[in-house]
Curated annotation (Swiss-Prot):
Source species: African swine fever virus (strain Badajoz 1971 Vero-adapted)
InterPro entries assigned to the protein according to its UniProt record, in alphabetical order: MGF_505
Residue ranges of coiled coil: none
Induction: Expressed in the early phase of the viral replicative cycle.
Stated family: Belongs to the asfivirus MGF 505 family.
Sorted UniProt keywords: Early protein
Protein name, per record: Protein MGF 505-4R
Described function: Plays a role in virus cell tropism, and may be required for efficient virus replication in macrophages.
Keyword check for DNA repair: no
Length: 505
């Protein structure tokens, strides 16, 4: 059962002005050497009616003074047990640690709240861990004095490297600098890896400070070729990440913003870097053309393409073939759209290329839709290249029902009649004959198709169809008519085959 004093202490948020020191002491609301103590918020106390501090800070101070009564009061006000341990360690009051230590699951959890190196180390001792654990936690919570105190045990390069990497990853700059300047390391250049990975400018500048103070034994700063190679590699990484200020910092020490570096800026659409260095280096037209081709190959953004085209005054006549090849290679035709707006039309060569590379119908549909290309044109191009499967795929998408075969049949015959390209005609006629074999034609329509084959010198299809028609009424006179057409067109093979058929009649 709670006493009246306990209830008052826990829930009385505002003390009456009439309470004197004796009354406060009786209520347990008097803190020796400090004065009256009252709770004013869930997480704060009012000391001597003129000082507001957090409950946990008050708890730390009370524990450091060994004031168990005030500690108990503050804990009832929802204070954190961690601050009892911290304060007790500061004042060496191990009786409080013994009393409240059972409330602590893991003393490592307290370390983040400690700001004094001596207290930090004493708290870590309570966890009964080894020295390596202490050093790692000292890095984690930025306790450089602990590393300095135990400098004599940090002699193993491999372990020091592990600590250095941890400090870099945790971004504990004072510790990074101290380890880099003081301890022997296997790979001090690791600092640069983290600097670029985290885009951490402070680590980059520290890295260069260590490098040029001869703290990186693996890199000879007096070997100009090696140094330029390292710095240029850094410039390439910075361009990849879009870290413009990293590049400026690196250039203070050397390096070369070459085409490989600028190509990374293009690939990742870092226009600020591109714009700055194209102007600064006064790049030749040839180099800018190369960058444009890199942009096309990597599907760069419209803004990146536009920037590079603007430096070329949208004139690309020297690299038209290469542009088309780059577009065909990666399938991104954004540049074709841009150039068309500038009256540079690469639509047809690109379409021919896409057909040659046998891009999917879905892709080609996007392309012909974007540039408002008639399907007939695409089919004729595919026919010229002998891409029969592509034409079939296209027609299957356009005419989805089996009933549409008749429409396809007429459509293809009309295309053949408007084509001059011999191979293209042959490709379409092969498809027409395939369709003929699965549809039913009236006698009149069969004769029309035979005449069509003769008109276009489709000897193989004519002979194949002859077998289906030789018993039809009026076929022999029709053959004579076909012979006249073949003679007028001067188709020797067709003439010879028709004459042979007439002899057999």
């Amino acid at each position: 059962m709670f006493s009246l004093q306990d209830i008052c202490r826990k829930y009385l948020f505002q003390l009456p002005d009439s309470f004197d020191e004796y009354t406060l002491q009786v209520l347990g609301l008097y803190w020796e050497k400090h004065g009256s103590l009252q709770r004013i918020r869930k997480d704060a106390v009012f000391v001597q009616r003129n000082l507001i501090i957090s409950i946990n800070e008050a708890l730390r101070i009370a524990a450091s003074e060994g004031n168990g009564r005030v500690v108990k009061l503050l804990l009832s006000w929802e204070g954190n047990f961690h601050y009892v341990i911290i304060g007790a360690l500061e004042g060496d009051h191990y009786d409080l640690i013994h009393k409240y230590g059972s409330q602590i699951e893991d003393y490592h959890m307290i370390l983040s709240s400690i700001h004094n190196a001596n207290t930090f180390e004493k708290c870590h001792e309570l966890s009964n861990c080894d020295m390596w654990c202490l050093i790692q936690n000292a890095i984690k919570y930025n306790m450089l004095p602990i590393l300095q105190k135990h400098r004599n045990i940090l002699t193993h390069e491999g372990e020091n490297q592990e600590l250095f990497e941890m400090a870099c990853e945790e971004q504990k700059y004072d510790i990074v600098l101290w380890i880099g300047q003081t301890l022997m390391l296997n790979e001090p250049e690791f600092i640069f890896d983290i600097a670029f990975e985290r885009i951490d400018f402070s680590l980059l500048t520290m890295g260069y400070s260590l490098l040029f103070n001869n703290k990186m034994s693996s890199i000879d700063i007096h070997d100009e070729e090696d140094l330029i190679s390292l710095l240029t590699e850094h410039l390439e990484k910075a361009a990849t990440k879009g870290c413009f200020f990293f590049m400026l910092e690196t250039l203070k020490h050397g390096g070369n913003v070459n085409m490989a570096v600028l190509s990374k800026a293009v690939e990742y659409n870092h226009r600020k870097i591109l714009d700055y260095f194209i102007r600064q280096k006064c790049l030749s037209r040839k180099d800018i053309e190369k960058l444009l081709l890199v942009a096309i190959s990597n599907s760069a953004s419209k803004k990146t393409l536009n920037l590079l085209l603007s430096y070329l005054n949208h004139s690309v006549k020297n690299i038209i073939g290469k542009i088309v090849q780059s577009v065909l290679k990666n399938g991104d035709f954004t540049i074709i759209i841009f150039l068309k707006k500038k009256k540079i039309n690469l639509v047809e060569p690109a379409l021919i290329g896409f057909i040659n590379y046998y891009y999917s119908y879905c892709f080609l549909e996007q392309f012909i839709h974007e540039f408002d290309i008639r399907p007939e044109k695409m089919i004729k191009m595919a026919a010229r290249k002998g891409k029969l499967n592509m034409i079939i795929e296209f027609l299957n998408e356009k005419y989805v029902h089996k009933d549409d075969l008749g429409a396809i049949f007429k459509f293809l015959k009309n295309l053949v009649c408007t084509m001059k390209h011999k191979k293209g005609k042959e490709t379409l006629i092969v498809l027409i004959h395939k369709i003929y074999q699965v549809i039913q034609l009236e006698t009149k329509e069969k004769f029309k198709l035979l005449r069509f084959y003769v008109m276009h010198d489709a000897t193989i299809q004519f002979i194949s169809m002859y077998k289906d028609c030789f018993n039809l009424a009026g076929f022999k006179p029709f053959l004579l008519e076909c012979l006249d057409i073949a003679i007028k067109k001067n188709y020797p093979d067709m003439i010879r085959n028709i004459e042979t058929l007439l002899k057999c009649e």
